Amino acid sequence: MIVERVLYNIKDIDLEKLEVDFVDIEWYEVQKKILRKLSSNGIEVGIRNSNGEALKEGDVLWQEGNKVLVVRIPYCDCIVLKPQNMYEMGKTCYEMGNRHAPLFIDGDELMTPYDEPLMQALIKCGLSPYKKSCKLTTPLGGNLHGYSHSHSH
């Protein structure tokens, strides 16, 4: 099956009458233009994202009758911080940005994919990070696709 656009998002509808099949898209794949995946029910899915918009949790990629194929972003190990004041918020953003770490937000938690050296660096600079399994669905701007820039002087 080849999919070229998002039809709608499941948050907008009642799922009770639908037969839902999920395709897992990792947080770092949501902006890829071409993906090849296997759905939970074993259906091979080709996704051609020509409009460049990031896929979101709950996006419906295909529907036929009462059957739908829905994007699911799996949980992954994350570094989580809950800044208690503006100083901690600034320090967190500075340290993560300095390492080009993707930053996500959920309520009052800032999250980035788990990386032991980053965890140790955050502890060393006086912050209180902890490890937690999270869905990275709400990016806080910046670099999601792994591209970086250089600091040539």
Swiss-Prot record:
SMART domains per UniProt: UreE_N (SM00988)
CDD domains, sorted: UreE
Biological processes, Gene Ontology terms: protein folding; protein-containing complex assembly; urea metabolic process
Primary residence: cytoplasm
Transmembrane regions listed in the UniProt entry: none
Keywords carried by this UniProt record: Chaperone, Cytoplasm, Nickel, Nickel insertion
Cellular component GO terms held in the UniProt record: cytoplasm
Domain of life, per lineage: Bacteria
Function field: Involved in urease metallocenter assembly. Binds nickel. Probably functions as a nickel donor during metallocenter assembly.
Name of the protein in its database record: Urease accessory protein UreE
